[in-house]
């Protein structure tokens, strides 16, 4: 099983290569309204158990939040539920904005 955390640069590299990834934004809708990563699916942390079927995919599941704490917990929980490909993007959308795409608003 791969490490639970993945760097934003690795996520970007995999996306740019055309690899199919399921990017899951586990933040709240009010946070999503402020900034988002194009192509990500919003599934707030509290609704993950009810949406587990969406995450039952052959694609690698990359979770992210604001700084990487909530997404780490979600990825860990998903692995316990059998989603072995679940990973957390280290540093969250904040790090994505700083290192990958400065057009993504910081908050």
Enumerate the language-model features and the residues they cover.
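Rhodanese-like catalytic fold shared by cysteine-dependent sulfurtransferases
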Residues: 1-21, 29-60, 69-107
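Short, surface-exposed ligand- or partner-binding patches at beta-edge/loop junctions that are enriched
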Residues: 64-65
């Amino acid at each position: 099983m791969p490490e639970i955390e993945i760097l934003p640069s690795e996520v970007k590299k995999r996306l740019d290569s055309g690899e199919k990834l399921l990017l899951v934004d586990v933040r709240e809708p009010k946070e999503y309204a402020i900034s988002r990563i194009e192509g990500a699916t919003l599934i707030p942390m509290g609704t993950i158990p009810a949406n587990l079927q969406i995450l039952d995919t052959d694609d690698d599941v990359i979770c992210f939040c604001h700084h990487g704490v909530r997404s780490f917990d979600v990825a860990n929980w998903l692995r316990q539920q059998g989603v072995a490909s679940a990973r957390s993007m280290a540093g969250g959308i904040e790090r994505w904005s700083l290192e990958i795409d400065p057009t993504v608003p910081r908050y």
